[in-house]
Swiss-Prot record:
<comment type="similarity">
    <text>Belongs to the ATP-dependent AMP-binding enzyme family.</text>
</comment>
<keyword id="KW-0276">Fatty acid metabolism</keyword>
<keyword id="KW-0443">Lipid metabolism</keyword>
<dbReference type="InterPro" id="IPR005914">
    <property type="entry name" value="Acac_CoA_synth"/>
</dbReference>
<comment type="function">
    <text>Converts acetoacetate to acetoacetyl-CoA in the cytosol. Ketone body-utilizing enzyme, responsible for the synthesis of cholesterol and fatty acids.</text>
</comment>
<dbReference type="InterPro" id="IPR042099">
    <property type="entry name" value="ANL_N_sf"/>
</dbReference>
<dbReference type="Pfam" id="PF00501">
    <property type="entry name" value="AMP-binding"/>
</dbReference>
<dbReference type="InterPro" id="IPR020845">
    <property type="entry name" value="AMP-binding_CS"/>
</dbReference>
<dbReference type="GO" id="GO:0006631">
    <property type="term" value="P:fatty acid metabolic process"/>
</dbReference>
<keyword id="KW-0547">Nucleotide-binding</keyword>
<dbReference type="InterPro" id="IPR045851">
    <property type="entry name" value="AMP-bd_C_sf"/>
</dbReference>
<dbReference type="GO" id="GO:0030729">
    <property type="term" value="F:acetoacetate-CoA ligase activity"/>
</dbReference>
<keyword id="KW-0963">Cytoplasm</keyword>
<dbReference type="GO" id="GO:0005829">
    <property type="term" value="C:cytosol"/>
</dbReference>
<dbReference type="InterPro" id="IPR000873">
    <property type="entry name" value="AMP-dep_synth/lig_dom"/>
</dbReference>
<keyword id="KW-0067">ATP-binding</keyword>
<protein>
    <recommendedName>
        <fullName>Acetoacetyl-CoA synthetase</fullName>
        <ecNumber>6.2.1.16</ecNumber>
    </recommendedName>
</protein>
Length: 672
């Protein structure tokens, strides 16, 4: 095999080792490497050798992993993939095979093993759901869905917290071949309808209220408005989550029913049996949503087979997960990490579903769960680790964390000082893995790896089968320098298509407009030629991503436009030296109106209600002008560069270039 050519500067900042793999431990990655070597007649001495082979011979790699993973199927594949096609051709994977995603997640026959631990803010009790109980519940959900006419290809959606109901409804939909989408209760009406109205769901599951940050938040008024905006709904299933059903009024929601009554429609004298529709590998499983930077969020369709095999690769090989593991991923059902998390059931591992604030009643709430349940893997946001450090929390002194062997960080880049904090104040022997990918691939391009050291400030490595490079503007791979994160070869987890994108133009524009035929992900990164590690440098487009909550500026504009006092607005991110992001909203006032604190408060409140508290900008400032391109587009990226102190090449691209000067040296933006 040829080594990758790595021209460019080799001098990289100090590479401090924070953790090293146990050479005596025979991981699943080790076993897979040995199996590949034996099957293919290769001398693969280490992870680097295995990685290079996996991207150079990607068809063979995925075929070997199919065998290794033990995927359950009813018909074998005829062809792994047509290697004459590139990633922009979106080739079909494992053609001819038949399988079911839900069947693979529910295949483990140790009936008494716990599959789900359900924990909620303000509740002492932890509910345990065994694999057998989970199968029975999924069968009930699926039978009721079939009874109301849900069939293959129909859309079933959840407006739900991170609960057992979301998992059960999703698996039931998948067992039938229906397509699942979900958003979390912190989404406002506009945010939900911007997404769900595009996919015309037949069935929606929701709750009547949630508890967060010590407060109860009623959900019924929002649900009523959402249902009004989804005319294709045949049924609205309401789950009593905070209150008993006697205290919930469904009279204002047409076609609504309580969960128990819905499930009863699918039962007869005998309990329903699980049935798994056998579907093509490429059959749609999830519709995920982009941030909506340039309008309505894009609807990314992810296949059942592609999602399954990619998640199995990450959990089995990169995470070394087994049936003895228990994973807690702090997420909502509106983030791709929820889908990623649920797939661990296919390994036989259990997961903890926590719904609530990670800081209430104390900042130790997740650590308390780690000790109480015996959690082995904790997945959280980089921001949460920073908050713990700011609060001088030292779990190493207050908790045993005996079973915990892995902490994964995602959502935003994990800063170098957080590595030091984790190993000093949490646990010195764990693997701390920063992982990075996105909703677009419903998984990771790079991440944790039990075969490699952890270096301070770096993601350990590019993941198997992911031909990732950093490219400069000329389309050349660069090493040790910042570049656009690209993927050069087909992957089974890329979307099969976008919903409502018949000619594929939105799909091509989203990923292949920067470098023809090459997937450009919209992130800047730097690959260390010495360690193979990756440093993420932030978004390369106008998407907003504060604390891992990714959304588009147009979602903010849609709210602000309703205020008659505002003529125009511009929403951009600002980064500090740690690559933490905050959102700045600039308002250009309409004639005869003044910029007032009361207006700022009303806009903040409207964004919180219409979208979520996480969408509210950190600062709202007045501006006298907003730059536009000649073809009438707001110029967000240039303003982002200016407030970061970078030079902007004006050229002839702007219709009003003089407005750019308004964004230089703004006092309120200094010192972040």
């Amino acid at each position: 095999m040829s080594k990758e050519e790595r021209p460019g500067r080799e001098e990289i900042l100090e590479c401090q080792v924070m953790w090293e793999p146990d050479s005596k431990k025979n991981t699943q990655m080790d076993r897979f490497r040995a199996a590949v070597g034996a099957a293919c007649g290769l001398a693969l001495e280490n992870y680097d050798d295995l990685y290079r082979w996996s991207v150079e011979s990607y068809s063979d790699f995925w075929a070997e992993f199919w065998k290794f993973s033990g995927i359950v199927f009813s018909r074998a594949y005829d062809e792994v993939v047509d290697t004459s096609k590139g990633i922009a051709d979106v080739p079909e994977w494992f053609k001819g095979s038949r399988l079911n995603y839900a069947e693979n997640l529910l295949r483990h026959k140790e009936n008494d093993r716990v599959a789900l631990y359900v924990a909620r803010e303000g509740k002492e009790e932890i509910v345990k759901v065994t694999f057998e109980e989970l199968r029975q519940e999924v069968a009930l959900f699926a039978a009721a869905m079939r009874k109301m006419g849900v069939k293959k290809g129909d859309r079933v959606v959840g407006y739900l917290p991170n609960s057992e109901h979301a998992v059960e409804a999703m698996l039931a939909a998948a067992s039938i071949g229906a397509i699942w989408s979900s958003t979390s209760p912190d989404f406002g009406v506009n945010g939900v309808l911007d997404r769900f109205s595009q996919i015309q769901p037949k069935l929606i599951f929701s709750v009547e209220a949630v508890v967060y940050n010590g407060k109860e938040h009623s959900h019924m008024e929002k649900l009523q408005q959402v249902v009004k905006g989804l005319p294709d709904l045949k049924k609205v299933v309401v789950i009593p989550y905070v209150s008993s059903r006697e205290k919930i009024d469904l009279s204002k929601i047409p076609n609504s029913v309580f969960l128990d009554d819905f499930l009863a429609t699918g039962t007869s004298e005998q309990a329903p049996q699980l049935e798994f529709e056998q579907l093509p590998f490429s059959h749609p499983l999830f519709i995920m949503f982009s941030s909506g930077t340039t309008g309505a969020p894009k609807c990314m369709v992810h296949s059942a087979g592609g999602t399954l095999i990619q998640h199995l690769k990450e959990h089995l090989l990169h995470g070394n997960m087994t049936s003895s593991d228990i994973l807690l991923c702090y997420t909502t059902a509106g983030w791709m990490m929820w889908n990623w998390m649920v797939s661990i059931l296919a390994t036989g591992a259990a997961m903890v579903l926590y719904d609530g604030s990670p800081l209430v009643p104390t900042p130790n709430v997740l650590w308390d769960l780690v000790d109480r349940i015996g959690i082995t893997v904790l997945v959280t946001g980089a921001k949460w680790l920073s908050v713990l450090e700011e609060k001088a929390m030292k779990p190493v002194e207050t908790h045993s964390l005996q079973m915990l062997h892995t902490i994964l960080s995602t959502g935003s880049p994990l800063k170098a000082q957080s590595y030091e904090y984790v190993y000093r104040c949490i646990k010195s022997s764990i693997l701390l893995g920063s992982i990075s990918g996105g909703t677009d691939i419903i998984s990771c391009f790079m991440g944790h790896n039990f075969s490699l050291p952890v270096y301070k400030g770096e993601i350990q490595a590019r993941n198997l089968g992911m031909a990732v490079e950093a490219w400069n503007e000329e389309g050349k791979a660069v090493w040790g320098e910042s570049g656009e994160l690209v993927c050069t070869k087909p992957i089974p987890c890329q979307p099969t298509h976008f919903w409502n994108d018949e000619n594929g133009s939105k799909y091509r524009k989203a990923y292949f407009s920067k470098f023809p035929g090459i997937w450009a992900h919209g992130d800047y990164c730097r690959i260390n030629p010495k360690t193979g590690g990756i440093i993420m440098l932030g978004r390369s487009d106008g998407t907003l991503n504060p604390n891992g909550v990714r959304f588009g500026s147009s979602e903010i504009y849609n709210i602000v436009e309703s205020f008659e006092e505002v003529e125009d607005s511009l929403c951009v991110p600002q980064y500090n030296k740690f690559r933490e992001e905050r959102v700045i909203l600039f308002l250009k006032m309409a004639s005869g109106h003044a910029f007032q604190p009361d207006l700022v408060k009303r806009i903040r409140d409207a964004i919180r209600v219409g979208l979520s508290a996480r969408h509210v900008p950190s600062l709202i400032l007045e501006t006298k002008g907003i730059p536009y391109t000649l073809n009438g587009k707001k110029v967000e990226v240039a303003v982002k560069q200016i407030i970061a102190g970078k030079a902007v090449e004006q050229g002839g691209a702007f219709s009003n270039p003089e407005t750019l000067d308004l964004y230089r040296d703004i006092p309120e933006l200094q010192g972040f």
